[in-house]
């Protein structure tokens, strides 16, 4: 098992230490052990979760929804986790549809300046 400090976890995930600490406060991550000095230690599963949470956040999934999923996973609540995964899948599908619509609108946009723009001062 690899043991990660907050700073090493952040570095390996490509995020700031502040993001890791924020995710800890929100319950998205939790240490698997503590040093004698009281610092949290994390394992490979925490790194994988951090990468997942960050990717989901970057894709537009809110941290509150992700926190509900993480809490259900941490509580070994299979039904709760399944329900939260279903909610996230619905959000992803809505995002996918919105992006497809946006792509069609972008494709239909003219690339030339409007003709009436020539008459503007």
From Swiss-Prot:
It holds the Pfam family MerR_1. Residues 3-72 form the HTH merR-type domain. The keyword Ribonucleoprotein does not apply. The keyword Transcription regulation applies. Keywords: DNA-binding, Mercuric resistance, Plasmid, Transcription, Transcription regulation. GO terms for biological process: negative regulation of DNA-templated transcription; response to mercury ion. SMART domains: HTH_MERR. Gene3D superfamilies: 1.10.1660.10. It comes from the Bacteria. Residues 6-25 bind DNA. PROSITE patterns: HTH_MERR_2. GO terms for molecular function: DNA binding; DNA-binding transcription factor activity. This is HTH-type transcriptional regulator MerD.
